[in-house]
Amino acid sequence: MTPLSLKRRRLLQAGAALALVNLLPGAAAEAFAQGCPAGWPQWEAFARRHVQADGRIVDFSVPEQQSTSESQSYGMFFALAANDRARFAAIWQWSRDNLGAGSDKLPAWQWGRREGGSFGVIDPNSASDADLWFAYALLEASRLWQMPQYLKAGMMLLNQVKAQEVRAMGELGPMLLPGPYGFDAGKDRWRLNPSYLPLPLLRRFAGVDPAGPWAAMAQGALKLVTQSSPQGFAPDWVIYDAGKGFQPDTERSVLGSYDAIRVYLWAGVTDDGDPLAGPLRAALAPMTKAIAAYGGPPEKFNTVTGAPEGRGPVGFSAAVLPWLKATGAADSLAAQEKLVQDKWQTWSRATPKAGADGDGEFNYYNSMLTLFGWGWLQGQYRFDATGQVTPAWACRS
């Protein structure tokens, strides 16, 4: 090849890359311009340990060796982000066959070893956050992979959520119950979970179902977080009374911990162009100061007093990476990213055996938080303001 033809090829390649950047949503274009990640070793490591050949995702950290609708739905999202079609299909098929997902009922939330030693559904109640992630993964798989059968399944599941897990809650408007059963706390009183409502998912659902409750629910989600976090720290659970507003859940817990850490995660991965991103982050600004003061996210907050307790595990540090990036906390971002990276390298070099004894710091839940938080920071996926996801493989295509 002559120097002239080599130069011409490079110019053509650069022009093609620039054209692709211009076709991508803003955040995705920025990620592409900075260089797409070549692979996703954290997903591959998780899949080797936790995703069985039949699509069952196992949490080895509990005696039940359970699989949950959360694990299955999160796994489908990560498989989509990794362009892992075979695992996506297997995870969905296992979920349909064993949890009931995609049938005429919502999926059971817990499957595993039952009393007596047999395996099967332990709790048939559903978990609405997982139901949303199932629907979202299916809708986006249909769009990105051009597979209309996933669109049909996603819309069917979304309709079931509307029918069984959404309630009109006075001035709060339509709101998502954590599940169909067990969350009515009295007349016009409900127990809610602020971490169940990622804004990008609600935006995407509003796009495919504009007559549905999703746009109003996004406004309600902002109220849920801001009005239930008086000290700027989100609770795991909160009571909403249609006559009195939000009240601490003194019966269950006033703490913000393993559920609530996802509130900061979702606020961080929300596109800056979403009009609710700014108010949401402003309401939770004390978390940024707490991370700087304690060298990382505390494990727990008393959300009434604001008092912290303990140091969060590595998954918490990974979960707040998008939050720290979005809020411009450069020093804390660098420190927490280094912590996650160092712990990951140490853990992966040890090549621990699969199972509860070998999970170590990167057990099921810490791994899930790491895939979401560190994966986002790596550029493995981005949401735009309409809730559509752009995975890294799309900008490499």
Residue spans of the language-model regions?
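N-terminal secretory signal peptides and thylakoid transit peptides that target proteins
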Residues: M1-A19
